[in-house]
Amino acid sequence: MRVLFSILGVLTLLSIVPLARSFLENQDCSKHRHCRMKCKANEYAVRYCEDWTICCRVKKKESKKKKMW
């Protein structure tokens, strides 16, 4: 029974991995991301673009919390 589950697990992984890889490869920088050589102070690096520049995304602004007491 363990062998059967192991074989089914391996087959499941082999079928999922190519789908995930092709999904991630096709993603380019969207309108919220920019390809640059260096990210600005208000951005962080997400991935590399096709020409080896860095895909930068704007950081979310942190809300200032007021102390209640």
From Swiss-Prot:
Belongs to the beta-defensin family. The lineage of its organism: Eukaryota, Metazoa, Chordata, Craniata, Vertebrata. InterPro entries: Beta_defensin_dom. It comes from Mus musculus. Disulfide bonds join 29-56, 35-49. Residues 1-22 form the signal peptide. GO terms for cellular component: extracellular region. Transmembrane segments: none annotated. One of its GO terms (biological process) is innate immune response. Has bactericidal activity. Keywords: Antibiotic, Antimicrobial, Defensin, Disulfide bond, Secreted, Signal. It is found in: Secreted. This is Beta-defensin 43.
